[in-house]
Structure formats: C-alpha cells, structure tokens
C-alpha cells in the first residue's frame, strides 16, 4: 500500500533531518493526482507552513512534465524536495526486485538510476 511507501520514505528523513523533511516525505506522492488543485497546495501551506508547501510543490510531478528533463531538475532545485526525492528513489530502487515484469524492472532501474546520478548519489 502507498502509505507504507510514504512511511518508508519519511522515517529516515525524520531520523536524519527532522519533522519538516518527514512531513514532506509523507506527502511526497499525495498531490500527484489530477483532481488536486491549487487550493490543495495552499491548504498544505496553511497546515504545515510555507517551507513544507514549497517542498511538496517541488517534489510533485506535474501532469505532462518530462521526468528527467524537467521534473527532476525542478525538484532538486529545492533542498528539502531533493533530499525527499533521493530517499524516495532509493526506496523505489531497493524494491525493484519485487516487480514481476522484467521489462518494467529494466525501465525503472534506468529511470531511478539516472535520477540518482543527477542527484550526485
């Protein structure tokens, strides 16, 4: 379930960087739905503050945004979002062995590996 992934991303962030990073880790996939609106991001900021809102915006891939050419550089421009995304990528990368389709494993290995290289990891 998606909540377990969010918790797996948030836990090491909490241990290394604290509450702000952990909150963004918990929310890092929450806004990647077509039904989310600008008001949802504003609401996030009202609840958790502008630093969390900015990082959640940065870590949220926009519909139609090219992953490696647009999204990853934009995400990595925000220091909190970058740490969250790297933790997310590491979690995803470490779980690739559970994906049954070998073509999907190869594609995602390349995608996550390239993004981690872009982060300097």
Which sequence ranges carry the predicted segments?
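Active-site helical microenvironments for divalent-metal-assisted chemistry
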Residues: 1-121
């Amino acid at each position: 379930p998606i909540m377990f992934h969010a918790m797996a991303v948030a836990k090491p962030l909490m241990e290394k960087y604290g509450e702000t990073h952990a909150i963004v880790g918990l929310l890092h996939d929450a806004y990647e739905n077509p039904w989310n609106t600008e008001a949802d991001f504003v609401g996030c900021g009202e609840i958790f503050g502008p630093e969390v809102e900015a990082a959640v915006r940065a870590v949220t891939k926009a519909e139609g945004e090219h992953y490696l050419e647009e999204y990853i550089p934009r995400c990595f421009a925000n220091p909190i979002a970058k740490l969250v995304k790297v933790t997310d990528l590491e979690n995803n990368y470490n779980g690739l062995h559970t994906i049954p389709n070998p073509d999907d494993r190869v594609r995602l290995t390349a995608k996550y590996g390239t993004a981690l290289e872009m982060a300097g990891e």
